[in-house]
Amino acid sequence: MTHTRRIHILDPRLANQIAAGEVVERPASVVKELVENAIDAGSQRIEIDLESGGARLIRVRDDGRGIDQEDLPLALSRHATSKIASLDDLEGVDSLGFRGEALASISSVSRLELISNTHDEPSDGWRVVAEGRQMEPRVTPAPHPRGSSVVVRDLFFNTPARRKFLRTEKTEFGHVEEAFRRLALSRYDIGWILRHNQKVVHQLRAGDASTSMERRVGALLGRKFLENALHVDIEATGLRLWGWVGLPTHSRAQADQQYFFVNGRVVRDRLVAHAVRQAYRDVMFHGRHPVFVLYLELDPHVVDVNVHPTKHEVRFRDGRLVHDFLFSSLHRALADVRPNATSTEGGDEATPSTDATTATAAEASAGQAEPRWQQQGMALAAGQERERPAAHRVREFMAGYRALHPEHEASLLTPQPQEAAEEAAGTPAPPASSSPAMAETDDTQAPPLGYAVAQLHGVYILSQTERGLVVVDMHAAHERITYERMKQQVHGDGQALGRLQTQPLLVPVSIAASAREVETAENERATFERLGVELDVAGPETLLVRQVPVLLGNADVEALIHDMLGDLERFGRSDRLEVHINELLSSMACHGSVRANRRLTVPEMNALLRDMERTERSGQCNHGRPTWTEMSMHELDKLFLRGQ
């Protein structure tokens, strides 16, 4: 005989331990919660001490506002907080913590001691102690400077099952250090100290000046990150994105150097990850992950941070706006990375340049006279634009290279790829025009990639610059140039497939779809039309594809439509069609670019260098491999022990 179990209220001690299972996973979780409380208290200096990776001891000390004596017992109670008092406060919360669960959860699985003082006199401090399931905290006087100290000993001492899941001391400290890194990157105006087993691991000074910020980023992520990163600062539509994004050539095998903050809170969000992945799509080597430290600032009322137990996920009121802002900002910044004539301090290395960082930098450069080599290139490009419409740029580019050395026309550039692109776009072929190579000028400012001096094994171009030697992979560089010209012809300036020739299907493709997919297809009809796809609703669970772009060829239309609908539902946009078309253009550009063992004349090599300087994303080929590298005179001198 079975008995029905009656519903009852959980014992407070059991409820706290259940909550601890969500909040307290390992020592790093404790550090995160305690430090966030210290930040919310207005601290200017935070010290963290650990023993045995945090399993034996965690101490967090701050110089914040402190907690009143009367509030100390409440601080260890569930759902007790000073940070919000109403639903309106929750909807616009700007503090890191607000649920009032952290200290109660931590104290239920450890021996916790909290000492705090709200006055400047050290003798005015008070201590409250809680141990495991002991729910009657004891408050006693204790000297302490203004601020608070939280000491957590013997984590999971009363839950052996949880304690045995802890890893080695080194592993647990690694997780704590990563949590510290994220917290220290969130607030540059706070000084930080991290000690492990009484040894200082990190000591960071407070400072919100740009140099202080870069110094902290370099200390936490390494100088190599800063040397291979772009600083961005972009503001639009009530959103501001600033921080550092790594160059495509500075990537990692794991996504372990990706830090994204929303209003000072570190988050891991699918929408953000998708936007960043899209921005790097054309320039990142397959299987690699970008590195970045980015900060998004927006009105707290348009973002919900109360959607995850550890607050790692957020929900934006207008996810499509945020996604498009992130994508367009990063896409533009990465597209503008090109060889720059200025060098880093010491003159040893060339630095990438982008006009997407700040408006003041762009305005400052606008008033400066362009060097002669750049004026000539711009004049040539402008003249070609007046003579021919933009739809002919692919053929114009390829014809220009053939005109440089007509006796090698067949081996330099085969016409098939460009003709395929023109056929897809529905444009006639213009007559060929020459693009004369840039001759060496008398200007004191040489072009960033210098002037070609030789070709090595028919593969690499050797160029002399003001700083030293540049080596260019001519096939990879030409592949990127050709690819960008093809994309420009097909997509145009707005990345919309408006010029793309479409074809009606002789037999419409019937697609079985869910009710949600049908609803998305109806709502996004204009989006599909803009992409050259005619998609009709034929029934409550059926879609019909009547027209697709010509370039899709024999693609799996049904799978593509399902993927696009999924993206539109989750992220508010889909780039599946563009990706598929760009893959075809990339393959065409690869086969249509100058091959290894093709001997180029010096004018041809210089023409290629000038085109690299004018082409977006020319630092990487279509597959994400670097197209050029540089060795400074200092590096060359070191090889031969000159000046030793």
Curated annotation (Swiss-Prot):
Pfam family, one: MutL_C
GO MF annotation: an example: ATP-dependent DNA damage sensor activity
InterPro entries xrefs: DNA_mismatch_repair_CS, DNA_mismatch_repair_MutL, DNA_mismatch_S5_2-like, HATPase_C_sf, MutL/Mlh/PMS, MutL/Mlh/Pms-like, MutL_C, MutL_C_dimsub
Top-level taxon: Bacteria
Region spans: Disordered: 338-390, 416-445
Its job: This protein is involved in the repair of mismatches in DNA. It is required for dam-dependent methyl-directed DNA mismatch repair. May act as a 'molecular matchmaker', a protein that promotes the formation of a stable complex between two or more DNA-binding proteins in an ATP-dependent manner without itself being part of a final effector complex.
Record-given protein name: DNA mismatch repair protein MutL
Gene: mutL
